[in-house]
């Protein structure tokens, strides 16, 4: 199986006859997608483009479908990406805010259309086509005609309450004529004009990379006065409980919203069939640059709500809608220089410095170059004109150099021989293309390791940025991650520590100034975040240790099996290899890591400062009743709506009964859990197969 990017760049070849290679590829895709989700939603600073993310997700879904034995309920293909900040009150969505599956070409659209026809057994249906706005998803609630709450999508299950900030949007009415409970969903964004105005503000300490980041930062600002000045816009496109309005079609819902003076897009069209959809997509693709705001695709929905339950849902996507994604834009610019950096594992990275260029709404001047072999194989030289495409909101990727535009000024970039941080000799490991710094005392490596320990997937110490960690380490206030837990006793030192900053002047020069690394409030916030991390479950600490091959997913599996760091440290390779998501390389890496006296000392110190070493099961206190023992190790399917979200019910069933939850009814299904407005097709199939139906909310007992 080949994967080709932009029909130019072959990424890898996968031997489809080798199950181990397939599993490794699936695990790598899951790991990468989890990281990309964190970067996009949590950091708002993605390292890959939407297109590249979508390609990874599409490949993962294909492999999981083709090899169901490697499927997992915890795969990122089953989850809605998102992130919940600690700054705002958390609110649980009554109905989860799901994402959409993607289409990338006409073939994908025709397959989507064919799947709909099969699901409803007819071609008598139509579509609604809507621009996909590149903004921040929002849920707004009205009660008695008054706007009472606004919540971001968050992770799809829980979002952030931004009610005060949403009220600053001038086009959104605070009162409507409809006097019953109403929830509407849409997108908050900035027009291109308003984005340019914000970024041209001389008082802005750091420019936003693009309009989406600016909209997100503005809506989630703690000061509503600042939000009001940003002139946010919003358009709405969905009513989760539209049937309560006695409306049966999506296009009619949009007309109803318009009558309530709730803003909707004027580019929405009703199409009688898939050919009409394809024609409309072609029109929007040609005119997308003329929009007053950024759009990153087109949403296609089945118009008639009566078909929705019949068509069904996955745990992540509704099957009655799809998002067509625009192909990535390729542009040319000049490569001026290449920076060499080192990461936490010692791997050497290459960042290209470019002539600044506008690419898909962002000003970009840097690009990633993978590794030195990539530079050499693609014959990329300094001063080349290169083709780049969007590989992130800040960092794009270089596809190739344009040799016919060379003017004689080009220079070969030499392969580095020494670490850019510590000057140690670089080494290329067996069967790897990357160069590594093996010096354990390398300053930059150690800083990156502490940053990884603090990251969301690991100990999740909010507010502890890489710049703060760097200052703490370089000022010898900390020597490793465990030293973070001693900072509470060093308040005077921390507040006295100065950090250098540089401000760019109008004439291109820079002015240096200093300010304290911490003030009283920021010190208190950091210490509270550090203290809070002590009570994390075992898998978070295990992930943060940065043991080779052990990411969060593997750490979870190991934690469930061994229950404590102490038990894992005493486990043999054979015992470790019996755990799902592990293997020979991981077991060897773990045993070697726990055998190292230096690491044993680190664990002793971690225990001493109070870091939790035990696995915490949130369902540990649940006692399974006798009448529910039959659910143990069985396969369930869920249909309809309940007093809890499907993901909550799914998590409960999997954790309490060690059971599997599937998306579709088959001969392997043991139980069908049925809620309100359940789909007729699943019920019919379950009855035909004589599968037991459950209607009681046993998770409440």
Swiss-Prot record:
It is an enzyme of class 6 (ligase). Its cofactor is Mg(2+); Mn(2+). One of its GO terms (molecular function) is metal ion binding. Residues 626-701 form the BRCT domain. Its EC number is 6.5.1.2. Keywords: DNA damage, DNA repair, DNA replication, Ligase, Magnesium, Manganese, Metal-binding, NAD, Zinc. The active site is at residue 132. It catalyses: NAD(+) + (deoxyribonucleotide)n-3'-hydroxyl + 5'-phospho-(deoxyribonucleotide)m = (deoxyribonucleotide)n+m + AMP + beta-nicotinamide D-nucleotide. NAD(+) binds at residues 50-54, 99-100, 130, 153, 187, 301, 325. Belongs to the NAD-dependent DNA ligase family. LigA subfamily. This is DNA ligase. It comes from Malacoplasma penetrans (strain HF-2). The lineage of its organism: Bacteria, Bacillati, Mycoplasmatota, Mycoplasmoidales, Mycoplasmoidaceae. The gene is ligA.
């Amino acid at each position: 199986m080949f994967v080709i990017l932009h029909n130019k760049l072959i990424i890898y070849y996968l031997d489809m006859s080798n199950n181990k290679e397939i599993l490794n590829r699936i695990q790598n895709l899951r790991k990468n997608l989890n990281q990309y989700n964190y970067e996009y939603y949590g950091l708002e600073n993605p390292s890959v483009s939407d297109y590249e993310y979508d390609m990874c997700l599409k490949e993962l879904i294909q492999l999981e479908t083709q090899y169901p034995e490697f499927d997992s309920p915890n795969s990122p293909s089953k989850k809605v990406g998102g992130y919940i900040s600690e700054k705002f009150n958390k609110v649980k969505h009554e109905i989860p805010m799901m994402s959409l599956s993607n289409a990338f070409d006409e073939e994908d659209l025709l397959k989507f259309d064919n799947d709909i026809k099969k699901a409803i057994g007819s071609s008598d249906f139509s579509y609604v086509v809507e621009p996909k706005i590149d903004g921040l998803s929002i849920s707004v609630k009205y009660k008695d005609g008054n706007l009472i709450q606004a919540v971001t999508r968050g992770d799809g299950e829980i979002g952030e309450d931004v009610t005060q900030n949403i009220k600053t949007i001038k086009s959104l009415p605070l009162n409507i004529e409809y006097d019953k409970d109403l929830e509407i969903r849409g997108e908050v964004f900035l027009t291109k004009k308003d984005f340019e105005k914000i970024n041209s503000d001389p008082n802005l300490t750091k420019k936003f990379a693009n309009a989406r980041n600016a909209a997100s930062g503005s809506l989630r600002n703690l000061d509503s006065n600042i939000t009001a000045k940003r002139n946010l816009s919003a358009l709405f496109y969905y009513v989760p409980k539209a049937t309560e309005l006695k409306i049966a079609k999506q296009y009619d819902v949009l007309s109803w919203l318009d009558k309530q003076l709730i803003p909707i897009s004027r580019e929405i069209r009703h199409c009688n069939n898939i050919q009409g959809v394809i024609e409309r997509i072609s029109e929007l693709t040609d005119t997308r640059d003329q929009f007053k705001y950024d759009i990153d695709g087109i949403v296609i929905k089945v118009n008639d709500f009566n078909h929705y339950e019949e068509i069904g849902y996955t745990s992540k996507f509704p099957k009655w809608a799809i998002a067509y994604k625009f192909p990535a834009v390729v542009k040319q610019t000049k490569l001026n220089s290449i920076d060499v950096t080192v990461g936490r594992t010692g791997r050497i990275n290459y960042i290209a410095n470019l002539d600044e260029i506008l690419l898909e709404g962002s000003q970009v001047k840097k690009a990633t170059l993978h590794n030195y072999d990539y530079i050499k194989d693609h014959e990329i030289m300094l001063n080349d004109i290169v083709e780049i495409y969007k590989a992130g909101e800040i960092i794009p990727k270089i596809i190739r150099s344009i040799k016919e535009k060379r003017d004689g000024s080009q220079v070969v970039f030499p392969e580095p021989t020494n670490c850019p941080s510590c000057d140690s000799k670089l080494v290329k490991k067996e069967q790897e293309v990357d160069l590594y710094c093996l010096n354990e005392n390398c300053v930059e490596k150690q800083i990156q390791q502490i940053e990884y320990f603090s990251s969301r997937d690991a100990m999740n110490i909010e507010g502890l940025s890489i710049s703060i960690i760097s200052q703490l380490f370089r000022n010898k206030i900390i020597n490793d991650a465990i030293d973070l837990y001693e900072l509470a006793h060093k308040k005077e030192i921390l507040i006295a520590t100065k950090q250098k900053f540089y401000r760019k002047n109008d004439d291109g020069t820079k002015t240096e100034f200093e300010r304290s690394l911490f003030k009283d409030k920021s010190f208190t916030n950091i210490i509270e975040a550090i203290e809070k991390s002590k009570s994390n479950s075992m898998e978070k600490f295990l992930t943060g240790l940065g043991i080779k091959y052990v990411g969060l997913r593997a750490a979870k599996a190991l934690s469930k099996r061994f229950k404590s760091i102490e038990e894992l440290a005493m486990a043999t390779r054979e015992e470790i290899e019996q755990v799902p998501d592990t293997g020979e390389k991981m077991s060897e890496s773990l045993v070697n890591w726990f055998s190292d006296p230096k690491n044993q000392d680190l664990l002793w110190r971690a225990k001493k400062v109070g870091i939790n070493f035990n696995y915490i099961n949130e369902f540990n206190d649940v006692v399974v009743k006798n009448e529910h023992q039959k659910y143990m190790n069985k396969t369930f399917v869920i249909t309809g709506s309940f007093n809890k979200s499907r993901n909550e019910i799914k998590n409960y069933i999997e954790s309490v009964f060690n059971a599997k939850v599937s998306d579709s009814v088959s001969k392997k299904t043991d139980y069908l859990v049925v809620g309100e407005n359940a789909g007729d097709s699943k019920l019919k199939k379950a009855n035909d197969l004589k599968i037991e139906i459950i209607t009681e909310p046993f998770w409440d007992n």
